Amino acid sequence: MLQTTLLALQGLSCMNCAQRVKAALESREDVHHAEVNVHYAKVTGEADTHALIETIKQTGYQATEAQTPDVELHLSGLSCGHCTETVRKALEAVSGVISADVTLESANVYGKADIQTLIAAVEQAGYHATQQGIDSPKTEPLTHSAQSQPESLAAAPNTVPATNVALATSTVSDTNTVLPTNTALPTNTTSTTSTADTASATSTAPVINPLPVTESVAQPAASEGESVQLLLTGMSCASCVSKVQNALQRVDGVQVARVNLAERSALVTGTQNNEALIAAVKNAGYGAEIIEDEGERRERQQQMSQASMKRFQWQAALGLLLGIPLMAWGLFGGSMTLTPETQTPWLIIGIITLLVMIFAGGHFYRNAWVSLKNGRATMDTLVALGTGAAWIYSITVNIWPDVFPMEARHLYYEASAMIIGLINLGHAMEQRARQRSSNALERLLDLAPPTAKLVTDDGEKVIPLADVQLGMILRLTTGDRVPVDGEIVQGEVWMDEAMLTGEPIPQQKSVGDIVHAGTQVQDGTVQFRASAIGSQTTLARIIKLVRQAQSSKPEIGKLADRISAVFVPTVVVIAIVAGLIWYFFGPQPQLVYTLVVATTVLIIACPCALGLATPMSIISGVGRAAEFGVLVRDADALQQASNLDTLVFDKTGTLTEGHPQVVAIHTFNGVSEQQALGWAAALETGSNHPLARAILQRAEGLTLATASQFRTLRGLGVSGEVDGIPLLLGNNRLLEEQQIDTRELQSLIQQQAESGATPVILTANGKPAALLSIRDPLREDSIGALQRLHQLGYSLVMLTGDNPITANAIAKEAGIDRVIAGVLPDGKADAIKQLQAAGHKVAMIGDGINDAPALAQADVGIAMGGGSDIAIETAAITLMRHSLYGVVDAVELSKATLRNMKQNLLGAFFYNALGIPIAAGILYPFTGTLLSPVVAGAAMALSSITVVSNANRLLRFKPKQ
């Protein structure tokens, strides 16, 4: 029974000692894997503890079973087995840790690691940890409910007021849909408390100010498990894919197994044992290995790919070296029919052909034999049967010619050699094309530099990327690529984030800003603190997401798989039936015609093209999308996105900038704009309210006076004195209660409200001094992107919790067709359902937090996120750059990918539907000739090359401007 044993080691002084112990342990047949450092050995296998200790003693060291952990942590926030597994992996990823035993409440850590680094690793995984016996302050959880309370716009310093959402009862156009207020409001609704509560003069109801909606970081469900990638060998066609996938799916703990023929890999998700996965693949007749380290796995995959290509090249050369001269001999007048004079030369050629078949085509026969033992048929079965039948017939004629009539003594040695040569040549060209299709993922992998510059007390030190730990201070200078995610603690830089987000314009970063692994410094120098390393970085998550998507299948691909599963047995039956028809009803010599027809049918059928049609398009399409900053979680999203007719947009943060700005200042009674802005900012100093921040942001650079006699006027605004001048700042009702004449302002107030802005009024000495127009403006590229989507034929809808007047104004400016306003997050999913019930194929575009229910309900969810956990985990498609042109790229690329997929599938089906009947001799009554097995072999190789080459066209895809 497979078990893991942890041993404490004594006497080791360096990693050479550790390697010696590791080699000794792994030399045992009952040890599958050993992980060793100078303190511990973690051994997986069937060996008992005593035997392992004796093995270590033989190397000159001592060992005992590890029982006392080096660090004990108290855990909180864990609720299931998936949580404990996540924390265990996070702890064991810390440098120096060899093993961690994790329960729902505690973790025993074995290894030499800093306690704070261990705690940080747990926090990074989304849970909480403190050292056993120490009551440390509990950090903020990643998943939380925002319990903000309503607050004045001019709140006291260090308070965070609630966000206000105005739901006015104004009449809107017929294109708007206003959901009833009583279905949209939470139960803890309170009255307005700040200047944000300004409503238009036409409003007849008090403005409602709901509390913020609960925000949460999307955590993977416990049932999702962890993903592991296997590198596979021996697969040749879609039948192999089906066999391996079924074998993996039957392993205990496996939830999802995705096998990729193009990449020769499998992505398995679940709680399975890795050794069991490898055993399952081997029992199915194929090879498999698991390499955890990304760099090592990539190197191994490249080595396997290069080795395969070289092997196919020399095998093709060997087959063609014999086949081409033989074929040329026959084409240019030489006799391919055996005579008594040529029996010996042809026998020598037959033996040479056999050697070529063994050395250049041995893999076909070995794989076919393994397939037969496992009760299945693959492409190798077809090749083995076809070439084997041709050679056996020829050698039989060669040895016993008298058994056959003269007209049946034609030899087909050249067919066996040429078929093997051509198919190997096709495999070599296909391998080269597949390498090109993986370039997008390779470029992502290349973004992470191999080293990092560590800042120490003794100066700067270059360390390997694998040695970077959480909390380390690292330095970046011009031209450097960022090794890990982190927060800038000193300096300022311009960052090129194009490869990560698709955004071509350099971004300025300074203290407090986050830098992401893989981005590049264009100018400047900074120091930053590592906050995410290894598989936790944004880049690593993107790579994982791309790999998962490339291994997934859309519905159209699953249809191809179902056909492929029965394809080869069907072809064998067709070959037998066709051969029998020619044997019993064909012209003389029937035996020759039977052999030619059966062999040609077997050779021309190409399940390989069918198996590659979908995965090659997916690999190219998903990879190209990643280069545009469009992350696809599942290939089925591409198929769904290609069928959309309606795009639904959230307003705040999607169509708009996401934060209010002062867009205009109107002054009265001789007050200057600068003076009015200074007074308003003085009253708002210390407030964190979004509208207060907008005023303070507009006043940056001004010298502000100190406000005195400050008062918060609930639901109205604020008052105070600046330089002895009494000031009021708030909504229209504030001025009415203070009996200040606002008749001259009413038309302007109405105009601002209708344009979607919030009018905030400032008075000085009892007279209007200024009206500040505050609104959340459209993003610079929103109008252009929406126009492009209109040109592509999409219906555009805005779905927002904002009031209808503001929503309608923004929609009119943006060019939105329809507005659904006054909807809180829990009602957005229902709005999507209504659109779907009307027969629309709907995509929801939102920020991935409050829009989560709608993103899940939509046919395709598209999250606008800068690579955050929330955005990546919520939607089927994530846009890494905050631009609506990413939506344009996503829908155009999805259409191009599905079109390419259909072309490949149609080509593969058409090729087989046309080729097999021709090979069976359907044209013989009209032409008097049969298709040569050699031509069939060339056609088979060409069909696979065509599919791969067509898929690679996606790598050059560019969205239309």
UniProtKB/Swiss-Prot annotation:
State the active site.
650 (4-aspartylphosphate intermediate)
Its membrane topology is listed as: Multi-pass membrane protein
Amino acids binding Mg(2+): 847, 851
Disulfide bond residue pairs = none
Q: Which reaction does it catalyse?
A: Cu(+)(in) + ATP + H2O = Cu(+)(out) + ADP + phosphate + H(+)
Could you say which residues bind Cu(+) 2 here? 80, 83
- The primary site where this protein sits is membrane
- Region (Disordered) residue spans: 131-153, 178-201
Stretches of Polar residues bias are at 142-151
Top-level taxon in the UniProt lineage? Bacteria
Which amino acids does the record list as binding Cu(+) 3? Answer: 237, 240
What does the protein in this record do?
Answer: Involved in copper export.
Among PANTHER family, the record links this protein to:
ATP7, ISOFORM B, COPPER-EXPORTING P-TYPE ATPASE
Name the record gives this protein = Copper-exporting P-type ATPase
Q: Which organism is it from?
A: Yersinia pestis
Q: What is the lineage of its organism?
A: Bacteria, Pseudomonadati, Pseudomonadota, Gammaproteobacteria, Enterobacterales
